[in-house]
Design a protein with these regions (language model features):
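Intrinsic disorder/low-complexity segments
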Residues: 1-97
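Extracellular, repeat-based ectodomains that mediate carbohydrate processing or recognition
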Residues: 97-557
């Protein structure tokens, strides 16, 4: 049993426990409810209890008040039924192969360890480590909501007995109390692939949306929405659809999802579809309610495809991407492109306003920011932001090749800023791996900030390292490392992610992990001053305060 239909009278305000007014038709409510432990007990229990209650009430109306022992037996029988249902394995979400949505509380915060492409050298893999906040093409991982003073976040977690079984996890940091709850296990993705990590967004009603991505087309993708606003205790699976050939059809697969919620306008999503027709075709779609989505728009399909990173404001959405030249394989990624829309995807243009016809299929496109193919350099995308004038700034690394190790140095962190008339491209600093990933902050006073694992870690030339904070006060012309946030770590720190509307007390979140062998992975976050907090791996209470990793500093940067 995966779904049921309940007739409801038009206009009735339903309890949102599995019944959401946003999914209501004219006179019937059709909503998929995952038959997890709680929903099954609720449904079956009431199906048994209500007839008993009606029997008792009818007896009263007819003047035949049931004898006290009989009434007591009915109560005891009801209690027994509910107790037995708790013990039946097939109704337990952990035991049911048909149950997707778990809605269970975990015992702590544990990130997934993942590797890709063994290299047969001292670095062991092309990339690897604690990748609970991987990858750069997944975003956002966290959203700050001022109304409730909480930063909600998701990550790729794992079980207590494995470092490599991917669970989709959701939690929050309470800025009023400084505490975190036990995280919620949303679902088991049935893989060890961190490319299936979840992403998060929050709509203007406060409902938390989790998009469960897939690496390619071999596994299904899912969408969930929180049962209650600003609450992570329970989620409902949403049966999302798109328009295809003028018909509504289910959405069952997407990759590298990047959902953004625009206040008063709805959702915009950048994502990838494999073999559509390019190996990695980058796409775009919109939705007013998160349920019914527009027709998929192919943005670009040059040669073997692309990776993209996107951003959105109230007025526009933009994406930067590279491309895979034909015949060279997906490890060769080069060039830098940028396009944007100011009307929710109806029209698209370059940064200079020139209109584009999509999909883009030729590498010599007017959207080209810089020709790195001609320089023999790979391009690894990291982050993108709009500045205070809503002009794009792109953060990326260039290197000589895909393999780990010094032979492909320098790995140069670079910014590309649209000035209004031209792209201004400036080197920032270097690190030792193509998959070192950090976030760019453009603050109201004009400060540019990067929080990233640029410092050599315990596993040199593997992804990540020690986290550092860099500042620029002149639009990226020069950078100063103002603080090293971690030091003498046993494992490399990786993928520092910026929350949407980042609050100074929760400014970045990341994970650690060994760069050359499977290991445990711990999650961390830092404040704007660079103080690092550890999310607890084991919790014996429902709420706790994360511990400082080092002595707190009040120096402001």
């Amino acid at each position: 049993l995966t779904a049921f239909v309940i007739p409801v009278k038009t206009g009735i305000q339903n309890h949102r426990k599995g019944l959401d007014s946003r999914f209501r038709g004219n006179d019937r409510l059709c909503y998929s409810v995952t038959m997890d432990n709680n929903n099954m007990k609720w449904l079956v229990g009431w199906a048994i209890y209500l007839p008993m209650l009606l029997m008792f009430r009818n007896g009263n109306r007819m003047g035949r008040r049931p004898a006290h022992p009989t009434y007591l037996k009915k109560i005891l029988l009801t209690i027994l039924v509910f107790s037995l249902m708790r013990m039946i394995p097939c109704l337990n979400a952990e035991a049911s192969s048909n149950s997707l949505t778990l809605n269970e509380k975990d015992t702590g915060y544990r990130g997934i360890w993942y590797m890709n492409q063994p290299s047969g050298d001292e670095y062991v893999y092309k990339y690897s480590g604690g990748l609970g906040t991987y990858c750069a093409k997944h975003k956002p991982f966290a959203v700050y909501c001022d109304k409730v003073k909480k930063t909600f976040f998701c990550y790729g977690g794992t079980t207590t007995d494995s470092d490599r079984k991917l669970l989709h996890m959701v939690s929050y940091y309470d800025h009023k109390t400084g505490m975190v709850p036990r995280p919620t296990i949303l679902l088991d993705k049935k893989t060890n692939d961190a490319h299936d990590n979840p992403v998060i967004t929050v709509d203007d009603q406060g409902y938390i949306w989790i998009f469960s991505t897939s690496h390619g087309t071999s596994r299904p993708s899912y969408v969930h929405s929180s049962t209650w606003p600003y609450d992570v205790n329970e989620f409902d699976q949403v049966n999302v659809t798109k328009i295809e050939n003028s018909q509504e059809v289910p959405i069952t697969n997407f990759s590298y999802m990047q959902p953004w919620y625009l206040k008063g306008k709805g959702f915009v999503c950048f994502f990838t579809r494999y073999n559509y027709p390019a190996d990695r075709t980058i796409c775009f779609m919109t939705s007013n309610d998160g349920v019914k989505w527009s027709q998929w728009l192919r943005l670009a399909a040059m040669d073997q495809g692309h990776y993209q990173i996107s951003t959105a404001s109230e007025n526009k959405a933009g994406t930067a991407f590279n491309y895979h030249p034909k015949g060279k394989g997906l490890n060769w990624r080069t060039n830098l492109y940028y396009i944007e829309t100011e009307d929710l995807g109806k029209t698209w243009n370059c940064a200079d306003g020139r209109k584009l016809t999509l999909p883009l299929t030729e590498p010599a496109s007017p959207s080209l920011v810089h020709d790195y193919q001609g320089e023999g350099l790979n391009v690894y995308l990291k982050d993108i932001r709009f500045d205070t004038d809503e002009k794009p700034v792109i953060l990326f690394i260039t290197s000589k090749g895909y393999e780990s190790g010094p032979k492909n140095d320098p790995r140069t962190w670079t910014t590309a800023r649209w000035t209004g008339t031209a792209w201004q491209i400036r080197p920032a600093f270097t690190s030792d791996n193509n998959y070192d990933m950090g976030s760019l902050y453009i603050e109201d006073d004009g400060t540019w900030r990067i929080i990233s694992p640029t410092e050599t870690g315990p596993q040199p030339y593997n992804p990540g390292g020690e986290i550092a904070m860099w500042l620029s006060g002149n639009l990226g012309q020069t950078w100063k490392k103002v603080k090293q946030l971690t030091k003498e770590s046993p494992r490399n720190h990786t993928y520092a992610r910026r929350p949407v509307n980042a609050h100074p007390d929760f400014y970045a979140i990341w994970a650690d992990g060994h760069g050359r062998k499977p290991s445990e992975s711990t999650l961390y976050f830092c404040d704007k001053q660079g103080n690092v907090y550890v999310l607890p791996r084991k919790m014996t209470v429902d709420f706790t305060k994360p511990k400082l990793l080092y002595e707190k500093s009040n120096v402001k940067y």
